[in-house]
């Protein structure tokens, strides 16, 4: 029976070694699984953080874009209001009563006489008769709302006192105050 005992001892040792190896493998597998799960949690957390950051940036871009769109729309509507206001001034000047227009033209002629005592005067066709007694030779018609253009005898000096050019000068220099009145100070 000596051989049986040796075989049994070898088998017992093999089973014990097998159990040890299995236990070690199971412990190693558990450790690998635990490590993999921890790494997976870190990866998921990092990806979630990246996704949140991307969403936050996207929201910020959308908000900035919306604010810019609102600002553009506001500026466009203000531009439209200013254009309508300008057109209202043009309409008012175009429809001045004849007496008022004659008075304004006389004042403009008087102003022009300071710089050009003699020369030619130009007006729109409707106002030609209002400047016949101006002391200037009538030079013809110009396309304008009203007012006068005076040219020296030699043609070297021109004065543009048309309502159009006066309005544009006043409009340009008064743009900020007009905007402040219409839209409030910014």
Swiss-Prot record:
GO terms for molecular function: ATP binding; proton-transporting ATP synthase activity, rotational mechanism; proton-transporting ATPase activity, rotational mechanism. It is found in: Cell membrane. One of its GO terms (biological process) is proton motive force-driven plasma membrane ATP synthesis. Keywords: ATP synthesis, Cell membrane, Hydrogen ion transport, Ion transport, Membrane, Transport. Gene3D superfamilies: ATP synthase, E subunit, C-terminal (3.30.2320.30). Belongs to the V-ATPase E subunit family. This is A-type ATP synthase subunit E. It comes from Methanocella arvoryzae (strain DSM 22066 / NBRC 105507 / MRE50).
């Amino acid at each position: 029976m000596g051989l049986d005992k040796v075989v049994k001892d070898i088998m017992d040792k093999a089973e014990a070694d097998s159990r040890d190896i299995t236990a070690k493998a199971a412990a190693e597998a558990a450790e690998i699984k635990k490590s993999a799960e921890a790494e997976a949690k870190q990866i998921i957390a990092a990806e979630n953080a990246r996704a949140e950051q991307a969403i936050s940036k996207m929201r910020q871009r959308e908000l900035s874009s919306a604010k810019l769109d609102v600002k553009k729309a506001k500026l466009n509507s203000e531009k439209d209001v200013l254009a309508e206001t300008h057109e209202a001034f043009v309409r008012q000047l175009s429809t001045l009563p004849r007496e008022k227009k004659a008075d304004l033209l006389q004042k403009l002629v008087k102003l022009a006489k300071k710089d050009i005592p003699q020369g030619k005067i130009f007006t729109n066709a409707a106002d030609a008769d209002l400047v016949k007694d101006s002391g200037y030779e009538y030079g013809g018609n110009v396309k304008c709302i009203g007012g006068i253009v005076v040219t020296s005898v030699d043609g070297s000096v021109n004065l543009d006192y048309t309502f159009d050019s006066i309005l544009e000068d006043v409009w340009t220099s008064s743009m900020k105050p007009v905007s402040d009145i219409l839209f409030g100070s910014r």
